[in-house]
Amino acid sequence: MKVRVRLAPSPTGSLHIGTARTALFNWLFAQRNKGSFLIRIEDTDKERSKDEFTSNILEGLQWLGLKWDEAPIIQSKRIHEHKEAIKSLINKGLAYRCFATEEELQTMRDAQINSGEAPRYDNRHRKLTKEQEQKFIKDGRSAVIRFRIEDEESVHWNDMVRGPIHWNSKDLGGDMVISRRAPANEIGDPLYNLVVVLDDAAMEITHVIRGEDHIANTAKQLLLYKALGFKEPSFAHTPLILNKDGRKLSKRDGVTSISDFKTMGYTSQAMTNYMTLLGWSPPEGMGEKFTLKESSSVFDFDRVNNAGAKFDWDKLQWLNSQEIHNWSNEKLLDSLIPLWTKEGWNLSSKDWGLKLVHLIKPSLILINDGIEESRVFFEEPLLKKDAIQQLEIPRAKEALKFICRKLEETPWHGKENEIAIELITSCSKSLDIKKGIIMKSLRAALLGTLQGPDLITSWGLLAMMENDQARIKRCL
């Protein structure tokens, strides 16, 4: 049996990290078992589904490196097949029209709650006579279609993550609605639990891998598999991603969409690396930093945890910084040029850009950090308090004047770093000023602060752009 798994997102929002982690686990499982990873866009919510969200989801998966093996299925294009299945269930006596109004159902639920019972449909219209149906139709009532769930049934499966799971059908809320309300002679839009079963069967899905919040749905869907005569897939219910308080991660916790992580400057490799660790434990000796290829060669559900996985920003940022630090200077430069362009900064030469990237790379956690780390090399900085104080100490400006005079006499000719060191040494010897004072004063004048990257390399970069003398002179 060839493994076939799927991701079935609803295009009602951008690709959420929870959905992306589900996609990742599906993809890894397919890769490990030489199977197929498929996409089904569940766009049956007509009001909220938008093409822009479908594009966002697919682009996000591509950015993460999670390529699908067949053309995506659009669920709404199968509505005819869905309605035909409902007709078949009605004809077999496994589904029926329920004419209960929303007001009647709410009154029923209120009474159950007041009696200390869990709200559930009481199956009141399961055995309507023809006369009763005709009266409801004459009264102009619309109807939903409900699937019969017998109270004495037991649902069970061996979950790939959680082991044996048993569910009493009496705890599933009564007969299940499988189509929206519509005029009595019509069938309304088919609903989630039914269409998922129909589509998974049509796509020959062998393993359904999704979040633990779908466990109750799985119990209902297994009853539908049985009624429809379909072979049941295997199920794996993965742990939810939690916030720092142990609640399900949501938009209220800040950034949760993959496109936002990308915009902030996270790398796709760091994202897939970190998401794999959200609920999965790597084998001993593998460590926490690995590629998609490495994790796909060892991924299995025996190492997926039951408990929720807390989102750890610090670990994600560490993985991201490690990934950036391992990039070649060329790759990082290619990522930074568009960001610099947005700031209005023009790169004079690739060689200069590569030297700048090499200088700032160790300081980067996010790709976007390259904007602020680079700013001082593109824009004349304001002097910070520590720089102003440094320039006010005795002999600081005397040293800078000496450096300025020497700069006018000394051609750099591509030897910026060597000449910078020679000038500092010459100044120290000629004026009998400690090198520490000279270097701090130069840093204050050139970079506007006493903090920052290596002074000699920074000075060399500014000299290549002929910006060093002007910055020193403004401080005299």
Swiss-Prot record:
Residues involved in ATP binding: 251
EC number(s) on file: 6.1.1.17
Reactions listed under catalytic activity: tRNA(Glu) + L-glutamate + ATP = L-glutamyl-tRNA(Glu) + AMP + diphosphate
GO-annotated biological processes: glutamyl-tRNA aminoacylation
Keywords, ordered alphabetically: Aminoacyl-tRNA synthetase, ATP-binding, Cytoplasm, Ligase, Nucleotide-binding, Protein biosynthesis
Record motif 'HIGH' region, residues: 9-19
Localization per Swiss-Prot or TrEMBL: Cytoplasm
Domain of life per record: Bacteria
Gene3D superfamilies assigned: 1.10.10.350, Glutamate-tRNA synthetase, class I, anticodon-binding domain 1, Glutamyl-trna Synthetase, Domain 2, Glutamyl-tRNA Synthetase, Domain 3, HUPs
CDD domains on file: GluRS_core
GO cellular component: cytosol
Positions occupied by motif 'KMSKS' region: 248-252
Pfam families: Anticodon_2, tRNA-synt_1c
GO molecular function ontology, one term from the record: ATP binding
InterPro entries: aa-tRNA-synth_I_cd-bd (IPR045462), aa-tRNA-synth_I_codon-bd_sub2 (IPR020751), aa-tRNA-synth_I_CS (IPR001412), aa_tRNA-synth_I_cd-bd_sf (IPR008925), Glu-tRNA-ligase_bac/mito (IPR004527), Glu-tRNA-synth_I_codon-bd_sub1 (IPR020752), Glu/Gln-tRNA-synth (IPR000924), Glu/Gln-tRNA-synth_Ib_cat-dom (IPR020058)
The protein's role, per its UniProt record: Catalyzes the attachment of glutamate to tRNA(Glu) in a two-step reaction: glutamate is first activated by ATP to form Glu-AMP and then transferred to the acceptor end of tRNA(Glu).
Family per similarity comment: Belongs to the class-I aminoacyl-tRNA synthetase family. Glutamate--tRNA ligase type 1 subfamily.
NCBIfam families linked: gltX_bact
Subunit field text: Monomer.
Protein name per UniProt: Glutamate--tRNA ligase
Species in which this protein is naturally found: Prochlorococcus marinus (strain SARG / CCMP1375 / SS120)
Upper lineage: Bacteria, Bacillati, Cyanobacteriota, Cyanophyceae, Synechococcales
